[in-house]
Amino acid sequence: KFGVADYGMNVWYGGLFDIAERLEDLKAIGFDGTERLEAVSEADAVHKAAGYRRLGMDFSTCRGPDVQSGIRWTAALGKSYVWIQHRGMGRDTDFEVSCRYAEALCRAAGRWGVTASIHNHMGQRVESQQELEEFLKAVPEAGLVLDTGHLSMGGGDPVEIVKKYHDRLSVIHLKDVYL
């Protein structure tokens, strides 16, 4: 499946959009869905999930107003992973502290049958290939939302990471990066 991370559209339109119109436009240009369904309540999550289904589209994970809600709603909607995303993943956070937070999130997600997956990203705690590999070694329960563009910009080799950690991939973000 090919989806799109619609974060850029949120930024472009300042968060002011109609989700049904957005999905129809994405479907018209060939996308199968988006990576994340973002919801503010259980009812909002169900309403938006029904909208995706009505259009024959899909999403991979659900983000709620807090980590626990995102995990629960992701599980309830039959999806398999959530992002490891919290205040403990900032660039200046100690690596061991970030790993401890991530391990707790992996346990919490695991109780719901969901994998917590690290998203490597410039400016975040896990940015370079070395940091990504150290993180995956330190937090063996974590899946991987591999961002090829950010890894390349950090000097890494996405193909090597895929070969080495294919069994931990939750999703891959493909980007066209000019180095």
What are these regions (language model features)?
Residues 51-55, 72, 76-80, 101, ...:
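Short, hinge-like loop/turn segments at secondary-structure boundaries
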Residues 14-21, 69, 93-100, 127, ...:
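Alpha-helix N-cap and loop-to-helix initiation/capping positions
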Residues 21, 47, 69, 104, ...:
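Short Gly/charged-rich anion-binding patches and loops
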Residues 68-101:
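Glycine/small-residue-rich loop that forms an oxyanion/phosphate-binding "nest" at active or ligand-binding sites
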Residues 34, 107-179:
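Acidic/histidine-rich catalytic cores of soluble enzymes
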Residues 4-8, 36-39, 59-65, 84-86, ...:
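A cross-domain feature marking catalytic cores of carbohydrate-active enzymes
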Residues 40-49, 90-103, 125-128:
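Active-site-adjacent beta->alpha loops and helix N-cap segments on the catalytic face
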Residues 1-80:
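N-terminal pre-domain/capping segments
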